[in-house]
From Swiss-Prot:
CDD domains: Ribosomal_uS17
GO cellular component: cytosolic small ribosomal subunit
NCBIfam families xref list: PRK05610.1, uS17_bact
GO annotation, biological process: translation
Gene responsible for this protein: rpsQ
Cross-referenced HAMAP family: Ribosomal_uS17_B
Protein purpose: One of the primary rRNA binding proteins, it binds specifically to the 5'-end of 16S ribosomal RNA.
InterPro entries (alphabetical): NA-bd_OB-fold (IPR012340), Ribosomal_uS17 (IPR000266), Ribosomal_uS17_bact/chlr (IPR019984), Ribosomal_uS17_CS (IPR019979)
Family assignment from sequence similarity: Belongs to the universal ribosomal protein uS17 family.
Protein's name in the database: Small ribosomal subunit protein uS17
Subunit structure: Part of the 30S ribosomal subunit.
UniProt-listed Pfam families: Ribosomal_S17
Length: 83
């Protein structure tokens, strides 16, 4: 069974070797049918501390690395401009 993958935006990189990635999911409201954007945050392992806030990244599921960390940064799709 292949590992699950998600694409999201880095919202925090304040921890060492860890980033927080916000993943958006669009679902229809069960009763009214309106499309609602739901956001979920995942902690992901970033071994080289390469990710910056605002980067678009792909994360893959992995074995538990800590109490809350079960994802790993697979690649940086789009980097934010550095000042």
């Amino acid at each position: 069974m292949p590992a699950r993958e998600k694409i999201g935006v880095v919202v925090s990189n304040k921890m060492q070797k860890t980033v927080v990635v916000a993943v958006e999911n669009r679902v229809a409201h069960p009763k009214y049918g309106k499309i609602v954007v739901k956001t979920k945050k995942f902690k992901a392992h970033d071994e080289e501390n390469r990710c910056q806030e605002g980067d678009l990244v792909r994360i893959t599921e992995t074995r538990p690395l800590s109490r809350t960390k079960r994802w790993r940064v697979a690649e940086i799709i789009r980097e934010v401009k550095k000042l």
